[in-house]
Amino acid sequence: MKKSTVNIGIVGWMSCISALILLGCSSLRHTLFQSGVLDLGIYDQVVYLISQGMPPISSFLGFHHMGNHAAWAVYPLALLYKIHPSAYWLLAVQAVSLALGALPTWFLALQAGLKERQAIAMAAVYLLYPLVFNVNLFEFHPEVMAVPVFLGVVLAARLGQVVWF
């Protein structure tokens, strides 16, 4: 059992380092004025408006954001904007969400019968998958926050945990 605890620590560290790398790359892109207005700009404005108690009617789109994507996940993000309104919050949440996907991937690999070292390798494969890096680098998309949730739901279904599924 101790070995499994050590390995989840390894996967946890891999996830933390990956989140920092993902955040660093997307922040650098944003700092160099390479961010686009039609993704990060819209969500930055919408989350800011929600944090101020105003209706999320984007000036870019001209209508209520729920009429565009119905992205309910942006409402809790407004709490972060209460601390300090910055698009970097969105980039950080996205980076952490993507990096957290390594944990359920590791558990799924163990549940599928892979050895612990192979399960760690699968978590690393997830983190090194080019799509994970590219989706992080390209603006902000709230659906990315669902990646670890979907992987967790698959794990719950495979474990027969209907309540979590």
Predicted regions and their residues:
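Transmembrane-helix motifs of polytopic, lipid-linked glycan transferases
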Residues: 92-113, 133, 152-155
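Short acidic/glycine- and proline-prone juxtamembrane loop motifs at membrane-interface regions
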Residues: 135-143
